[in-house]
């Protein structure tokens, strides 16, 4: 077996583990689900599930990408995001909303890092999407840094209304932050250079872009930015 075949096998195993865990959750076999997850984490990253959940996300990404070709590192990170989503699903099914949210957030960070590095990436069927993880976390206060990455992702993906929503969510979380105001002005400047058709496709027509920028300028004046 070549090294590339080994990597592909690891990725396939992560997808198979997720599919099995979905069935186990449906059957409420949570202990077995945790055992399957623990084995899958060990195979992928050499850590127990508990250790993965305790580690810093950037450290996990660095561990998976170290000394790997970009494609191999990317695929291993997608596998990790898939397993983290499964851990979150398991915790949610058991009513542990705190652990579920923490785990979904970690999965989201891993996935955002992956897709922002490779904008043209087509996700495998088993992998979570940014949108699905964002939806799981809608009731939770995300860090501004996470919202910044979500803004970049939604703009990159052409979901301009969602990018604008992230901007105002960031300002709500950090009122008067002039750096965020500056990032918002840069966002609107980029949007103004797009065609009317592109803006409409992104659910943010030009008049709403202009209105949003006017609102941001007013906000900036109120907060001394």
Where are these regions (language model features)?
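Long amphipathic alpha-helical scaffold regions
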Residues: 177-195
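Alpha-helical adaptor scaffolds
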Residues: 109-159, 172
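N-terminal alpha-helical interaction modules that lie
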Residues: 1-97, 101-120, 157-174, 194-225
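Alpha-solenoid helical repeat scaffolds
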Residues: 52, 119, 125-126, 181-183
